[in-house]
């Protein structure tokens, strides 16, 4: 088995090779990878089944098993995400801001790949394909370190990708999966500044905190999702029920799922029973404050810990408020900077929410579940950044590039 240093050397060399590939070559290779994923779906599902058997034997929660599971539909979605990338404009090589200085120098910026991108992730094997597609199209080599829970699935997907690249004359070293599941290797990976340009962690709060606190390699933080939907006093109640049901129950184990409902007391007695009725169709446990419990006897008491909790389960908290100010204050206190939504017909309250909520994605009258690179038109995303430097929100191709200055002269020297 290769050492991490050997993988780093290969990836660094491959990144220089990849930076020179033209758009047509990259798109042709991506099409071949997408075709290979669908053609090898049965073998990928067979590998995934091994992971599922182990996960169930180890008592993994249903929400996490859902994240781990691959079927024909999800494999086709992975392939479609890669195909979408072929239709997107390549940001690499874009030159902007060219200006002529008084001394005759022409100075501008050129968009270039980051180099080698390492992605550390947990139980979602689709990240293997998503991460490859975005890093490859943006001219970056990748080093992938998935969780031990999904190791068989990850190996199967990475092997299919590498073989498809090789069959099409592309250096397969542009994708490097770490097959050793020893957790100590993560700490080693985080210190590989000589080979890795940036690390992107995707997973639970513990993983992200460990990488952010201990990596000497620059990190783009993808945060956990304690996402809120605020039902304003001027909300369309039917719309609120529909949006909350979708945001909470369509997929509970994802970071853009709604974990907390905030509702104005002026509409709480009318809206809460209707919302609880809908959520109970999926057996969602509803935990609320005292006023929320007065509105519906099926609500159980919430603790202070509930307000900041990312459940990833069939549980939601309900906080009642007296004003939009209180709603904004509560959300900004407990959110994780991911995705927040207001349901309202009031223009001023909508704009206040957009302006004052501190999050990567802020919605008016829509589900938080749209916080996704594919839904935003970026193709498969590398993650949703909750930090403010370099990239924020769903990260597509441009987020995986940087710029350098290009300067054209005619023999000028500095006096």
Curated annotation (Swiss-Prot):
Keyword field:
Amino-acid biosynthesis, Cytoplasm, NADP, Oxidoreductase, Proline biosynthesis
User: What is an example of a GO molecular function annotated in this UniProt entry?
Assistant: glutamate-5-semialdehyde dehydrogenase activity
Q: What's the name of the protein?
A: Gamma-glutamyl phosphate reductase
Q: Which family does it belong to?
A: Belongs to the gamma-glutamyl phosphate reductase family.
What function is annotated for this protein? Catalyzes the NADPH-dependent reduction of L-glutamate 5-phosphate into L-glutamate 5-semialdehyde and phosphate. The product spontaneously undergoes cyclization to form 1-pyrroline-5-carboxylate.
Compartments annotated for it: namely: Cytoplasm
Give the record's GO CC terms. Answer: cytoplasm
**What EC number(s) does the entry state?**
1.2.1.41
Q: Which PANTHER family would you find in this protein's record?
A: DELTA-1-PYRROLINE-5-CARBOXYLATE SYNTHASE (PTHR11063:SF8), GLUTAMATE SEMIALDEHYDE DEHYDROGENASE (PTHR11063)
What gene does this protein come from? proA
Provide the species name: Lachnospira eligens (strain ATCC 27750 / DSM 3376 / VPI C15-48 / C15-B4)
Catalytic activities: L-glutamate 5-semialdehyde + phosphate + NADP(+) = L-glutamyl 5-phosphate + NADPH + H(+)
Hey, which pathway is this one from? Answer: Amino-acid biosynthesis; L-proline biosynthesis; L-glutamate 5-semialdehyde from L-glutamate: step 2/2
The record's principal subcellular location, in a coarse class, is cytoplasm
Upper classification of the source organism reads: Bacteria, Bacillati, Bacillota, Clostridia, Lachnospirales
What are its GO biological-process terms?
Answer: L-proline biosynthetic process
At the top of the EC hierarchy, this enzyme's class is oxidoreductase
Domain of life per record: Bacteria
| Annotated InterPro entries | Ald_DH/histidinol_DH, Ald_DH_C, Ald_DH_N, Aldehyde_DH_dom, G-glutamylP_reductase_CS, Glu-5-SA_DH, GPR_dom
Pfam families assigned to the protein according to its UniProt record, in alphabetical order:
Aldedh
